[in-house]
Amino acid sequence: MTMLLPQFELHKPTSLKEAVELARTLGEDFDYLSGGTDLLPNYKCGLNAHGNVISLAHVAELKAISPIEIGAGVCLRDLERSKEIPASVAYAASQIASPLIRESATLGGNLMLDTRCHFFNQSYYWRRTLGYCLKADGDVCHVIPKIMKDGKSVTNSFTCVATHSSDLAPLLIALGATCTLVGPAGTRTLKLTEFYSGDGIARFKLQRGEIFTRVSLPATTGLRSGYKKLAPRRSIDFPVLGVAAALELGKDGKLESLRVALGACETIPVLYDFSGKEKQADPGNTIFTNPNKGMPEVIGKKLDDALIQQIADHVTRTAQPKLNVPMEPAYRKKMAGVFTRRLLTELRG
């Protein structure tokens, strides 16, 4: 079966102002397009396609790159080769997809990947045979078909658990990045952790018409960071788990700060801020990860093997991967701790 792109009108603005005005005019019936390596395959599968596409490929304001700011339109190949940005960010970019895809795919596109699920990322005919799903055209989640509501087990027509599979999001969150959004209502800046919110459908705090324009990085002097990825293959595949860490050590080897972030585990990236400065909201249920529950006190302690294992055990205990991407949740849950231990050991030196 050949999957063809549906008909849509392509718009090519050359400035943010022009793009935002187009969005205002088109209302609800459009998508922004950057590299198109995720959006267009979804369109071919009939997944939430719109009648208009606004290409941001010719907006020069989105392509700047410096040690403290990266434009959303910077392609992943340029990130991979850059000597200006933290080496861990360049490495994470190099782990995405393939060299050919990285020539087109962008930072903004990777951070705003649509969530993925066995029951969603299929052809229209496959999904129609099953009866569709909550994320597209249906009214029930097939991954978790029953959910507790008001003390009763009811059909899950409320919560989508599709997985957010960005490689760059967990690392940038671990580094404490912020993002800038420009839209019809003006410009605003959010912590990257605040940008991600909700379930597998409503996964961004993004107002209609807003454009994700850039990521800003705090000073990384003295900050050690890294990223590890689990995937079925070393090329092409989305992560089924990503673990990032950023830490600061004093001269005595004691932890001054530690942030661990998980990707491809939940509907949004999960942050473990062991300093307690930035706490991810309690999900209020047992479906999603609560990184703060039982978090050990580790700041001010020497980062020895025992402390590293304690941190890794906490990540393993609390991680809640779902059965909706390749590899079993139990294995991915265990590997979350294994990767955390390996990363912290490497970063300790």
Predicted segments, located by residue:
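C-terminal structural segment of proteins
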Residues: M1-G349
